[in-house]
A protein has these predicted regions:
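Accessory RNA 3′-end/elbow-binding domains used by RNA modification enzymes
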Residues: 2-31, 37-54, 58, 62, ...
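The conserved catalytic core of RNA pseudouridine synthases
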Residues: 45-48, 67, 157-202, 207-210
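Residue-level signal for inorganic ion chemistry
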Residues: 68, 89, 145, 201, ...
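Structural signature of FAD isoalloxazine-binding scaffolds in flavoprotein oxidoreductases
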Residues: 78-93, 158-172
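Extended alpha-helical targeting/anchoring segments
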Residues: 139, 143-168
Length: 332
C-alpha cells in the first residue's frame, strides 16, 4: 500500500480506531436485517484490522447484543460464547413456519382460540429447566460438513439430534389475543445457556399448546456479564470507535490472579505456574496490570495428586523476567 493510500485510509477511520496494535471487545447493538458476519465486516473496516470475530451468532431478523473481539481479544471469544444469554422475544401461537420464525414460509395455521393464560403458564413451566432441545432445522449447525440451512434450502428433510440445554427463566410478560381469536402473541423473557434456540422454544411451546408457534421478534439483551445497555450502534461506532481493552475485559470476565514478574514470564512461554486454588478459568495479571493469560488448575501428567495452573490462552508475547536491581538484592 502506498503512503498516500495509507493516509487516505487512516483519514476514513473513526476516532479511537485501534488498527492492528490494540486489542479489545466492542459491544454492538446489531440492527435487524444484518447478519452477524455483516457486523464483523463493518467492524473490520472501522477498526482498521482484519482480525475480528464475534461471540455467538444472531439471526438476521434479531437485534441486540453482539460481542465482537478484535486482534488478540478474539482469543477471548470462545470463553464468552459459552456464557449464559438473555433474550426478549415475541411468540405467535396459531402459525407454524419452516424456519420457526417470521422469515420462513407458513407450514400450518391452527386456531388459538382455546389458549388461556393458565395453559400457557403450564406449558412454559414444562419448557423451563434442563431440556433436551431439537434445534431448528434452518440453523448453522453442520450436518456431514454442510450447514443445516443449506440442506433445507436444497429440499432435504433435515432432522437434527436433540441437545441438552438449560432454560433458567422463561417468563411471559405480555399476552395479546387477536380480535378474531386466530392467534395469540406472547412477549417473553428468557435466560438460558449457550446453544439454546429461542426459535425452537417458540416451536415447542406451540406444539405443547396444539396450535403451532413461531418467533416474530427477538432481541438479545445480555451475554454473560455484558449488557445491551452498554452497547453502541454501528452508526455511533463509525464516528467514535468505543471498546473495552483486552485486560479490562478479561479481568471483568474471570477471577484475577496477580502474578510476580517471574510467573508472568513463565506463562508467556506457555509454562505452568503454582495452582490458583480456584475452580474454572482465571485471568493471570502481570505486575503492570496487563492480563498475560487465562489459566486453569489441572493435574500434572502422571501425577494426579499435584495441581498446577496451566495457561489455556496466552495473550502476551514470550518475555524473559526483568533482571533484579541491586536495590532488590540482585547482582549487576
Amino acid at each position: 500500500m502506498s503512503r498516500s493510500s495509507r493516509q487516505s485510509r487512516d483519514r476514513e477511520l473513526p476516532e479511537g480506531a485501534p488498527g492492528t496494535e490494540a486489542s479489545g471487545l466492542v459491544l454492538v447493538d446489531k440492527p435487524a436485517g444484518w447478519t452477524s458476519h455483516d457486523v464483523v465486516g463493518k467492524v473490520r473496516r472501522l477498526a482498521g484490522t482484519r482480525k475480528v470475530g464475534h461471540a455467538g451468532t444472531l439471526d438476521p431478523m434479531a437485534t441486540g447484543l453482539l460481542v465482537v473481539g478484535f486482534n488478540k481479544a478474539t482469543r477471548l471469544l470462545t470463553a464468552i460464547t459459552g456464557t449464559d444469554k438473555t433474550y426478549l422475544a415475541t411468540i405467535r401461537l396459531g402459525v407454524s413456519t419452516v424456519t420457526d420464525d417470521a422469515e420462513g414460509d407458513v407450514l400450518q395455521t391452527r386456531l388459538a382460540n382455546a389458549v388461556t393464560p393458565e395453559r400457557v403458564d403450564a406449558a412454559v413451566a414444562d419448557l423451563t429447566g434442563d431440556l433436551q432441545q431439537v434445534p431448528s432445522a434452518v440453523s448453522a449447525i453442520k450436518v456431514d460438513g454442510q450447514r443445516a440451512y443449506h440442506r433445507v434450502r436444497a429440499g432435504e428433510d433435515v432432522r437434527l439430534d436433540a441437545r441438552p440445554v438449560t432454560v433458567r427463566r422463561f417468563e411471559v410478560t405480555g399476552y395479546r389475543r387477536a380480535e378474531d381469536g386466530t392467534t395469540v402473541d406472547l412477549d417473553v423473557e428468557v435466560d438460558c445457556t449457550s446453544g439454546t434456540y429461542i426459535r425452537a422454544l417458540a416451536r415447542d411451546l406451540g406444539e405443547a399448546l396444539e396450535t403451532g408457534g413461531h418467533l416474530t421478534a427477538l432481541r438479545r439483551t445480555a451475554v454473560g456479564p455484558f449488557s445491551v445497555t452498554d452497547a453502541v450502534t454501528l452508526e455511533d461506532l463509525a464516528v467514535r470507535f468505543t471498546s473495552t481493552e483486552l485486560s479490562v475485559a478479561a479481568a471483568g470476565l474471570f477471577p484475577v490472579r496477580r502474578l510476580s514478574g517471574e510467573e508472568a514470564s513463565e506463562l508467556s512461554f506457555g509454562r505452568r505456574i503454582e495452582a490458583t486454588g480456584t475452580e474454572g478459568m482465571v485471568a493471570a495479571q502481570a505486575p503492570d496490570g496487563t492480563v498475560v493469560a487465562l489459566i486453569c488448575d489441572q493435574e500434572r501428567q502422571g501425577r494426579p495428586e499435584v495441581l498446577s495452573a496451566k495457561p489455556e490462552i496466552v495473550f502476551a508475547p514470550a518475555t524473559a523476567p526483568a533482571a533484579a536491581s541491586t536495590q532488590d538484592g540482585g547482582r549487576t
